[in-house]
From Swiss-Prot:
One of its GO terms (molecular function) is structural constituent of ribosome. The gene is rpl2. It comes from Cyanophora paradoxa. This is Large ribosomal subunit protein uL2c. Belongs to the universal ribosomal protein uL2 family. InterPro entries: NA-bd_OB-fold (IPR012340), Rib_uL2_dom2 (IPR014722), Ribosomal_uL2 (IPR002171), Ribosomal_uL2_bac/org-type (IPR005880), Ribosomal_uL2_C (IPR022669), Ribosomal_uL2_CS (IPR022671), Ribosomal_uL2_dom3 (IPR014726), Ribosomal_uL2_RNA-bd_dom (IPR022666). It holds the Pfam family Ribosomal_L2. GO terms for cellular component: cyanelle; mitochondrial large ribosomal subunit. GO terms for biological process: mitochondrial translation. Keywords: Cyanelle, Plastid, Ribonucleoprotein, Ribosomal protein, RNA-binding, rRNA-binding. SMART domains: Ribosomal_L2, Ribosomal_L2_C. The lineage of its organism: Eukaryota, Glaucocystophyceae, Cyanophoraceae, Cyanophora. Part of the 50S ribosomal subunit. Its main location: plastid. Residues 225-259 are annotated as: Disordered.
Length: 275
């Protein structure tokens, strides 16, 4: 994927860059694999904001992605590579030999016309899904299951990949993109290769309105709010926060406080915490 920049015709285009979308081969999604999903806008079932800075944005059709790859031993042909507004990775449309269709995450190097397979005897090639026990050491993988048969949960964003480091007993050792090293059961499936569209991290938004198209609302600093809205708020003029350390809107310590729950079931599976 190449990145296209704009000339400074307006302040909004001065620093704006976009993807060229040169790898996209089909503009309209497969209708049978889409549905209109209600957007929560950061609210819970009572209408109370639980996630800030969300709301608005363009309407989207949700594409049903096959994270399980449960059509074992059925060859599939890559029919198209499509844009997905719900994620930063591209998606690949598969036509299975039994007549079914499905979407998977597009792996780097996967092209239209390629054949992909899923199962313990699948070849070690980009886009194929195998149990971790059958994947060679040092292989780059993505879409990794945490529970056998549940579907891929780890390493699903653009440009990311994990590495298989070791196999011992019923577990394999993985190095995740965050730097975390952990055990995963060897029966779990993973897909070979790195997810494409890695250059997405180099794109410059350029203007505030483009974030609004994406459904991202402005982030207001706590120090400019009223005391009723934030512990940092209030005061006459430009006042300091009035505390020894910054806190969240709910009064919990911010900036550096670890937020992972203690005594979590997976603590004994993590060899080294993320960096």
């Amino acid at each position: 994927m190449a990145i296209r920049s704009y000339k400074a015709y307006t302040p909004g285009t001065r620093n704006r860059t976009i993807s060229e979308f040169s790898e996209i081969t089909k503009s309209e999604p497969e209708k049978s694999l889409t549905f209109l999903k209600h957007r929560k806008k950061g609210r819970n079932n009572r209408g109370i904001i639980t996630t800030a800075h969300k709301g608005g944005g363009s309407k989207r059709l949700y594409r049903i992605i096959d994270f399980k790859r449960d059509l074992k031993l059925v060859p599939a042909k890559v029919a198209a590579i499509e844009y997905d507004p719900n994620r930063n990775a591209r998606i690949a449309l598969l036509h299975y030999q039994n007549g079914e269709k499905g979407y998977i995450l597009h792996a780097r190097g996967l092209a239209v016309g390629n054949m992909v397979y899923s199962g313990p005897n699948a070849p070690i090639e980009v886009g194929n899904s195998l149990p971790l026990s059958e994947i060679p050491l040092a292989t780059e993988i993505h879409n990794i299951e945490l529970t056998p048969g549940k579907g891929g949960q780890l390493v699903r964003s653009a440009g990311s990949s994990a590495q298989l480091l070791a196999k011992e007993g019923n577990y394999v050792t993985l190095r995740l993109p965050s730097g975390e090293m952990r055990f995963v059961r060897k029966e779990c499936y993973a897909t070979i290769g790195q997810i494409g569209n890695a250059e997405i991290s180099n794109i410059s938004i350029g203007k505030a309105g483009r974030n609004r198209w994406l459904g991202i609302r402005p982030t207001v600093r706590g120090v400019v709010k009223n005391p009723v809205d934030h512990p940092h708020g209030g005061g006459e003029g430009r006042a300091p926060i009035g505390r020894s350390t910054p806190v969240t809107p709910w009064g919990k310590p911010a900036l550096g406080r670890r937020t992972r729950r203690t005594k979590k079931y997976s603590d004994n599976l993590i060899i080294r915490r993320r960096k």
